[in-house]
Amino acid sequence: MAVRKLAPNTPGTRFASYASFEEITKSEPEKSLLVPLKKSGGRNTNGRITSRHMGGGHKRFYRLIDFKRNKDNVPAKVAAIEYDPNRSARIALLHYVDGEKRYILAPKGLKVGDRIESGEKVDIRVGNTMPLKNIPLGTDVHNIEMKAGKGGQMARSAGSYAVLAAREGVHATLKLPSGEIRKVRVECRATIGVIGNSEHENISLGKAGRSRWLGIRPQTRGMAMNPVDHPMGGGEGKSKSGGGRKHPKSPWGQLAKGQKTRNKKKASTKLIVRGRKAK
């Protein structure tokens, strides 16, 4: 994928860049794999905002993605590479030999006509899925399960991958995109390869309107608010110490710069060998 820059004909196009979509082979999605997507506007079931800066945006359908890859030993042919408005990665439409159709995350290098498969012992080839116990050390993997059978949860965004670093007993050690080194059970599945569309991070929206199309609302700085609205509000001018402040905080008073917020009693903490911010 390449990034396409626009001519600076207007202020909105001066800094804007778009994906070239050159890898897309089909413009209309598979209707049997679509479900309506209702927008929440960042509200929970009580109507209260739980995720700020969300709302509006273009209407979308949700594409049902096969994160579990549990259709074992049934070969599938890649029928199309498609755009998915709900994620940064591209998706691939698979036609299985028994007639079933499924979407998967499209790894880099996957092309229309390729054949892929899932199972305990399948070929080490881009797009194939198998348990970590059968994947060679040093292999780049994505769509990794944290709990066997639950479906992939890690390394799913554009350009993401983890490296299978070691295996010892019932655990495999992975180096994740964040830099975190973490253990997971060897029965957990992962897909071979790197997620495609790696240039996504280089795209510049160029104007506020494109954020609104994506459902992202404006974000007001805490320092620009009043003390009643934010712990960092108040003070005269751009005061960093006025209003009784000492440290930057979230709107709910949690320290925002460097303070660890993970619960130390969480059971999976012992599986993290090295944190993502460790030096």
Curated annotation (Swiss-Prot):
Keywords for this protein: Ribonucleoprotein, Ribosomal protein, RNA-binding, rRNA-binding
Sequence ranges of Gly residues compositional bias: 232-242
Stored SMART domains: Ribosomal_L2 (SM01383), Ribosomal_L2_C (SM01382)
The keyword RNA-binding is assigned to this record: yes
UniProt feature, compositional bias: Basic residues: 259-279
Region (Disordered): 223-279
InterPro entries: NA-bd_OB-fold, Rib_uL2_dom2, Ribosomal_uL2, Ribosomal_uL2_bac/org-type, Ribosomal_uL2_C, Ribosomal_uL2_dom3, Ribosomal_uL2_RNA-bd_dom, Translation_prot_SH3-like_sf
GO molecular function, one term: structural constituent of ribosome
This protein's GO CC annotations: large ribosomal subunit
GO biological process terms, semicolon-separated: cytoplasmic translation
Domain of life: Bacteria
Similarity section: Belongs to the universal ribosomal protein uL2 family.
Function text: One of the primary rRNA binding proteins. Required for association of the 30S and 50S subunits to form the 70S ribosome, for tRNA binding and peptide bond formation. It has been suggested to have peptidyltransferase activity; this is somewhat controversial. Makes several contacts with the 16S rRNA in the 70S ribosome.
Subunit structure, as described in the record: Part of the 50S ribosomal subunit. Forms a bridge to the 30S subunit in the 70S ribosome.
Listed name of the protein: Large ribosomal subunit protein uL2
Lineage: Bacteria, Pseudomonadati, Chlorobiota, Chlorobiia, Chlorobiales
